[in-house]
Regions:
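N-terminal, charged low-complexity regulatory/assembly segments
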Residues: 1-82
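A short, structure-level motif marking secondary-structure boundaries and short turns
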Residues: 65-67, 166-169, 224-225
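Amphipathic interaction/junction segments at domain boundaries or subunit interfaces
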Residues: 70-168
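Short, hydrophobic/π-rich interface segment
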Residues: 141-201
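Short, charged/polar, Gly/Pro-enriched secondary-structure boundary elements
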Residues: 162-164, 212-219
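Short, cationic low-complexity segments
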Residues: 184, 222-233
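C-terminal edge-of-domain segments
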Residues: 196, 202-212
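N-terminal functional module detector in eukaryotic proteins
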Residues: 206-208, 219, 225
Length: 233
């Protein structure tokens, strides 16, 4: 099925990104014989179409920066792929899809070092700007704590459309594969993420971010919980 044939309300929704489609097709190619691949992909498309018809319509469409590559709608497409192919796809492969969408932008920023005050302040400003965008759309409800020189950056989401979608349609079990990329992205900036909870299994998704040389990191060792989430003590 051509993407243009999908019956979605494009006045409020967007199509999955081309990079997301490429990643999903690569996993389908990995697990299915050639004669089945087109039919499997069409099942993913139809699931995407079906679930968007039951989904909220206030996420801003193309105007909202959260709806780009690796964003809310790509997460929805990845969940639809998981729904169709959960019997063959692995947890690590699901992580790889989101990593391949998100991490290229961070690879370009490897010169950033959050251990240095200049970059730490610049990161804080970026998060503060992101909060203003969130306040415009009220999709991800974001709160950034005041900046303090001697402490890590802290912000949290108390609402996350991807988590909301996962819980509503029964995909909460695969959300760790989509959330764990937050750790990998920070590591490329010489930073460490410390997290204790998410919007899927709690009331917020917390982000405490510091340089990878900060003593704070040793005080909050990382582990994987029974669901696959990367977390900190």
């Amino acid at each position: 099925m051509k993407d243009s044939e999908l019956q979605i309300d494009r006045s409020c929704h967007v199509l999955y990104s081309k990079p997301c489609k490429k990643e999903i097709l690569a996993k389908i190619t990995l697990h299915y014989p050639e004669v089945e691949r087109e039919a499997v992909w069409e099942q993913v498309q139809l699931r995407y179409e079906e679930l968007l018809s039951k989904w909220r319509t206030d996420l801003g469409g193309k105007k909202n920066f959260h709806n780009g590559v690796g964003g809310t709608y790509d997460c929805i497409a990845i969940m639809c792929f998981y729904d169709v192919c959960r019997d063959v796809v692995t947890f690590r492969e699901m992580e790889e899809i989101e990593e391949n969408l998100i991490l290229p932008s961070f690879w370009k920023l490897r010169f950033v070092d959050i251990n240095k005050p200049f970059w730490k302040k610049l990161m804080y400003r970026a998060f503060s700007t992101a909060q203003k965008h969130c306040d415009t759309w009220h999709d991800y409800e974001m709160d950034v704590a005041p900046y303090e020189n001697s402490k890590p950056i802290y912000y949290e989401f108390t609402a996350c459309p991807a988590a909301e979608f996962a819980k509503r349609f029964g995909f909460a079990d695969i959300m760790p594969a989509l959330c764990n990329v937050d750790y990998a992205s920070m590591e490329l900036l010489h930073a460490k993420l410390v997290r204790t909870t998410t919007c899927v299994d709690g009331c917020r998704c917390d982000y405490t971010i510091c340089g990878d040389k900060d003593p704070y990191v040793k005080e909050h060792s990382e582990y994987r919980d029974e669901n696959g989430y990367r977390r900190n003590k």
